[in-house]
C-alpha cells in the first residue's frame, strides 16, 4: 500500500529542502519523523508536516480498504523536491541601480509504503 502527500509553493529554496529530504529518504516513517523533529534546518518543518500528512493518508487508505495497518511498517519509498515558481523582487541600490532578489519556492513530495512481502521487513 502506498500513500502520497505533496506540499506546493513552500517558501524555502529547493536546494535547502533537498538537504533535509536526503536525510530521510529510505528510512522508516517514525524514525524519519524523529530525525526531522530535531533537525536544525528551517526546511525540516515543512518536510515534517508533509511526512505526517503522508502517514495520515496511509491510515485513511487502510481504513477505507479495510486493510490491517501498522504505522511501524511504513517506510519512505520516495521523497523528492521540485522547484516551484520564483517570485522576483528588486532591492534598490545606489545611483538608481537595483539588484534582483529571487524568492524561490519548492514543491515537496513524500510517498510512504508498506513492505510488499515479509522478506522486505
From Swiss-Prot:
CDD domains: Ribosomal_L22 (cd00336)
InterPro entries: Ribosomal_uL22, Ribosomal_uL22_bac/chlpt-type, Ribosomal_uL22_bac/org-type, Ribosomal_uL22_CS, Ribosomal_uL22_sf
Family per record: Belongs to the universal ribosomal protein uL22 family.
Protein name: Large ribosomal subunit protein uL22
Gene responsible for this protein: rplV
NCBIfam families in UniProt: rplV_bact (TIGR01044)
Subunit structure: Part of the 50S ribosomal subunit.
Coiled-coil boundaries: none
Keyword line: Ribonucleoprotein, Ribosomal protein, RNA-binding, rRNA-binding
Role description: This protein binds specifically to 23S rRNA; its binding is stimulated by other ribosomal proteins, e.g. L4, L17, and L20. It is important during the early stages of 50S assembly. It makes multiple contacts with different domains of the 23S rRNA in the assembled 50S subunit and ribosome.
Entry superkingdom: Bacteria
Highest classification ranks of the organism: Bacteria, Bacillati, Actinomycetota, Actinomycetes, Micrococcales
Cellular compartments per GO CC: cytosolic large ribosomal subunit
UniProt keyword rRNA-binding, yes or no: yes
Keyword Repressor: no
Pfam families the record matches: Ribosomal_L22
GO term, biological process aspect, one: translation
